């Protein structure tokens, strides 16, 4: 099976299981420039050809304002796919690192990026936003919430922001990070290196390492955690 067919099978199954796409949807795909968002963009673009429900996609990048940011290869990639590309310019980096000098910037940064993405999606006439969270992101988020916040929870596969009138969908839910990395390498996607000084210095990276260590002695651990989340209907996850 080709890498595209394999990834399409993951995405279509998630989209169908959670009714993520309806006829006439105009979907903003959040593009950070990383492997996850670029994979999602190419697969959703390809799926437009045959999916029974007709939809449009718009690619949106929130430019945080780091000096040296260059999304020209992403723009060319979108042109080849026939997808409109919007770069939302912001001063998020300056606000967080220069003005507020945040010691723990990740939470505020994520909140500000989400706000900018949602605003840009509305301006582009979109009714949904597709995010590139995959299988491993879901497991890591669930474990982080349990370890650091003492609660059982995760992001939802599909949700609705009533204040924005925007749906949020995560079509890569069934694809592992390994699947995404393989797809990225085979398709030679134009990944943009993150310029954030806090990149890889996060609780998520620590949880990723912990799960990798636990998996060595407990094969299939991530899949069992994911299955437990579905069985318990954590935040909209469903057993299939």
Summary of predicted features, one role per range:
Residues 4, 110, 200-203, 207, ...:
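Generic structural signal for well-ordered, non-membrane alpha-helical segments
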Residues 202, 216, 220-240:
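A short, charged, Gly/Pro-tolerant segment at domain boundaries
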Residues 1-140, 148, 178-186:
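ATP-dependent adenylation/nucleotidyltransferase module used to activate substrates
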Residues 57, 136-216:
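Catalytic subdomain that performs nucleotidyl-dependent activation
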Residues 10, 14, 146, 210-213, ...:
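Residues that form generic nucleotide/phosphate-binding pockets
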Residues 131, 195-199, 221:
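Short, surface-exposed helix-loop/turn micro-motifs enriched in polar/charged residues
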Residues 64-66, 92-94, 159-162, 175, ...:
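Residue-level detector of flexible, active-site-proximal loop/helix-junction positions
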Residues 18, 47, 51, 214-217, ...:
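Solvent-exposed amphipathic alpha-helical surface segments
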């Amino acid at each position: 099976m080709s890498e595209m067919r394999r990834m399409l099978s993951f995405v279509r199954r998630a989209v169908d299981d959670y009714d993520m796409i309806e006829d006439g949807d105009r979907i903003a795909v959040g593009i950070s420039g990383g492997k996850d968002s670029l994979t999602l963009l190419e697969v959703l673009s390809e799926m437009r050809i045959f999916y029974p429900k007709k939809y449009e996609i718009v690619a949106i990048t929130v430019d945080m304002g780091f000096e040296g940011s260059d999304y020209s290869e992403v723009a060319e990639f979108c042109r080849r796919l026939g997808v409109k590309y919007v770069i939302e310019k912001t001063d998020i980096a300056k606000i967080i690192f220069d003005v507020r000098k945040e010691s723990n910037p990740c939470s505020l940064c994520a909140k500000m990026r989400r706000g900018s993405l949602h605003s840009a999606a509305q301006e582009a006439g979109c009714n949904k936003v597709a995010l590139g969270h995959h299988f491993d992101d879901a497991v890591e988020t669930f474990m982080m919430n349990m370890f650091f916040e003492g609660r059982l929870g995760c992001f939802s596969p599909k949700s609705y922001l009533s204040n924005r009138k925007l749906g949020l969908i995560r079509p890569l839910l069934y694809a592992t990070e390994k699947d995404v990395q393989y797809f990225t390498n085979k398709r030679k996607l134009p990944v943009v290196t993150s310029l954030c000084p806090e990149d890889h210095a996060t609780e998520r990276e620590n949880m990723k390492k912990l799960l990798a260590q636990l998996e060595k002695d407990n094969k299939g651990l991530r899949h069992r955690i994911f299955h437990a989340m579905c069985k318990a209907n954590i935040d909209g996850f469903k057993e299939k």
